[in-house]
């Protein structure tokens, strides 16, 4: 079923002109989820169309474009719950594989948390085989990137908390950010992890990006401490710089939760977060006018604080962030997924923020289909080849998958 959505539009700050409307048509797919923990858009079968891959609590599945036929490629192979995955050709056979994080038990920081990878055959619709990588309690997020610029991608894994930490502050040990180089034989292994950062706490997500424009990958990491930038030094060590304080006024949850970097017109950029952890604020950081402070020696820590703008506080449990050019202008809109209803007038769902004067914190806000998806995760991509970026949201309490077809011209 699909329908044309009327968007509720409000403005954050004072904007000089009315922002162009974004028209979306929603389509709820037949697939029903237990919890849609994660979603990715990628071509699973080589037909040059983006399919929808989803992590469900006990399944990994993909929905085939254009009819969204459901293919379950893993069920019951991992310890419940599956919580994250990352696509990459791990074994070099030219077909996509997935690293998978499972045995999700957020209240247990001492045991559990499995890391594995699954691989399929020539027919990606048939069940895939599973191979272990390692374990760490509270495995939560993962992705692939070539961090050392050797032409090979590494698996980056972020647990949510440090091993053996306890509520409410989870402060006994830091949360390690783990990097697994792919071994020569990824089936037999061993997969040997490297720790590149372990002095932050409760790291809910990260993004690999090139924030310095030097064609070197950096990592943006959100935690109780706020927003950190991790940069690889020539010796191979990593330096952490605090660039955003997060929300330090709330307790025990504090800092920042989700993160994405977006593009502004004129070559600028912004960093978007949810604050505090599992929080009620949509926040954007813009680059400061002053030059970045220079450090005198390798490994030295220092702050490079960006300007913090709170765009929205009328939400409960923001849980997904994406940046995409939805209207064909020169900047990327900020897309936020809200997981819970705060009130009858402030519901879960997808929200879009369009920069009007980002440096001054002026953005327009559009509410898309309020109350329809308790958004656990979302992704953006052109699903029908019309040149417009569409949105896909997966739900927790709503157990659903919805496409928002972009009708912008």
Regions picked out by a protein language model, each given a short descriptive name:
Residues 6-16:
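Bacterial N-terminal signal peptides
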């Amino acid at each position: 079923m699909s329908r044309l959505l009327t968007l509720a539009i409000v403005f954050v700050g004072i904007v000089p002109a009315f922002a162009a409307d974004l028209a979306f048509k929603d389509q709820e797919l037949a697939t029903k989820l237990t919890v849609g923990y994660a979603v990715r858009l990628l071509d699973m079968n080589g037909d040059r169309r983006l399919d929808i891959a989803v992590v469900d609590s006990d399944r990994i599945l993909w929905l085939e474009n254009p009819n969204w036929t459901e293919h379950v490629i893993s069920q019951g192979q991992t310890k419940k719950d599956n919580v994250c995955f990352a696509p990459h050709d791990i074994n070099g056979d030219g077909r996509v594989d997935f690293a998978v994080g499972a045995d999700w038990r957020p209240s247990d920081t001492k045991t559990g948390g499995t890391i594995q990878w699954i691989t399929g055959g020539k027919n990606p619709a048939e069940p895939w085989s599973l191979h272990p990588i390692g374990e760490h309690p509270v495995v939560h997020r993962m992705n692939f990137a070539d961090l050392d610029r050797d032409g090979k991608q590494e698996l980056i894994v972020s647990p949510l908390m440090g091993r053996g930490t306890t509520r409410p502050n989870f402060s006994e040990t830091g949360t390690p950010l783990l990097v697994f180089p792919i071994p020569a034989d990824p089936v037999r292994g061993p997969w040997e992890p490297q720790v590149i950062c372990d002095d932050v706490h409760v790291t809910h997500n990260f993004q690999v990006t090139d924030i310095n424009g030097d064609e070197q990958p950096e990592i943006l990491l959100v935690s109780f401490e706020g927003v950190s930038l991790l940069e690889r030094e020539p010796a191979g060590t990593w330096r952490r710089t605090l660039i955003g304080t997060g929300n330090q006024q709330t307790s025990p949850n504090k800092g920042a939760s989700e993160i994405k970097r977006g593009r502004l017109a004129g070559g600028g950029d912004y960093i978007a977060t949810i604050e505090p952890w599992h929080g009620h604020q949509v926040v954007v950081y813009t680059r400061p006018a002053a030059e970045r402070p220079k450090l005198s020696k390798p490994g030295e820590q220092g702050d490079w604080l960006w300007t913090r703008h709170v765009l929205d506080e009328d939400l409960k449990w923001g849980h997904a962030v994406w940046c995409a050019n939805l209207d064909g202008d020169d900047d990327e809109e900020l897309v936020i997924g809200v997981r819970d209803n705060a009130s009858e007038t402030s519901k879960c769902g997808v929200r879009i923020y369009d920069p009007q004067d980002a440096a001054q914190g002026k953005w327009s806000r559009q509410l898309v289909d309020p109350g329809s998806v308790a958004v656990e995760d979302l992704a953006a991509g052109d699903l029908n080849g019309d040149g417009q970026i569409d949105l896909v949201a997966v739900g927790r309490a709503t157990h659903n998958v919805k496409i928002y077809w972009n009708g912008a011209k």
